[in-house]
Each structure stands twice: as structure tokens, then as C-alpha cells.
Design a protein with these regions (language model features):
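Membrane-helix boundary connector in multi-pass membrane proteins
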Residues: 60-69, 87-108
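Short, strongly hydrophobic alpha-helical membrane anchors
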Residues: 1-8, 133
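Alpha-helical transmembrane segments of polytopic membrane proteins
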Residues: 41-50, 72-75, 105-118
Length: 133
């Protein structure tokens, strides 16, 4: 990947994504703490969010060579983690008595938070690839 000149939109956006991952990661931590980390899979997004935030800052500074590809892979892992979390949360809501009722959607695992996590990973990856060709 080529070096970036100046501070184009994609670089500034990567910094915004890094901050967003810290905020969303904090919210994920609080929800999983409320659920007492019952499943080992709950540790994934909690540990991954700060790592992705660091990758976002590194990606905003440079995307040359292996660094750019590593940042891209880390954001892709965030996307996959978000998709897995969305499936797990929807399965958790469906398993509750009453299934997909408004009460279960509000009291159970948040159905949209993992999707937001994955969407941030996707937009971060797109920002890394911005003008790379």
C-alpha cells in the first residue's frame, strides 16, 4: 500500500473509528459484565476492541507495507467478531421464553450492538483501503 500524503478524510476517519471502538468496547464490557461473562465468547469483543482501537491509530499514522495489511486484517477480524456476536445475541433472544418479543429485545442481549461492532470493523477496513489502488 502506498504512503498517504497529508491528512485526507480516510486518515481522520480511522482516528474516529479508533475512538468509537473504545466507546463501543466499553459498552460491550458493561453488558457482558452484567451477564457475568457466562460464555467464554464474551471475552472476544471485550479484548478485541482496544486492540482494534490501537490498530486504527497505527493505521491513521501509516499504512505502508505489512503494517497496512495487518491493520486491514485486524479490522476484518472485528467485522467477523461482530457478525458472530449478532448471531449469538439473536440466538440468545430466541431462546428466552416468548422468543422475539419487545420485552426480550429490551431485557435480553442487545441485538444491534454486535452489528455496530462489525459495522465499525467494516468501515475501518474500507478507510484503510481508501485510495489504495
Amino acid at each position: 500500500m502506498d504512503p498517504w500524503e497529508g491528512w485526507p478524510y480516510a486518515r481522520a476517519y480511522l482516528l474516529l473509528v479508533a475512538v468509537a471502538f473504545l466507546v463501543v468496547g466499553g459498552q460491550v464490557y458493561l453488558f457482558h459484565l452484567r451477564a457475568a461473562f457466562r460464555a467464554k465468547s464474551m471475552y472476544g469483543p471485550v479484548l478485541l476492541a482496544p486492540a482494534i482501537a490501537v490498530a486504527g491509530v497505527v493505521g491513521a499514522v501509516t499504512r505502508e507495507g505489512a503494517i497496512g495489511w495487518t491493520v486491514l486484517v485486524i479490522f476484518a477480524i472485528g467485522l467477523v467478531e461482530g457478525l458472530i456476536g449478532t448471531v449469538l445475541h439473536l440466538r440468545g433472544i430466541a431462546a428466552r421464553i416468548g422468543g422475539f418479543t419487545v420485552r426480550n429485545l429490551t431485557a435480553g442481549p442487545p441485538p444491534l450492538l454486535p452489528f455496530a461492532f462489525g459495522a465499525l470493523g467494516l468501515t475501518g477496513a474500507l478507510a484503510v483501503m481508501w485510495d489504495a489502488w
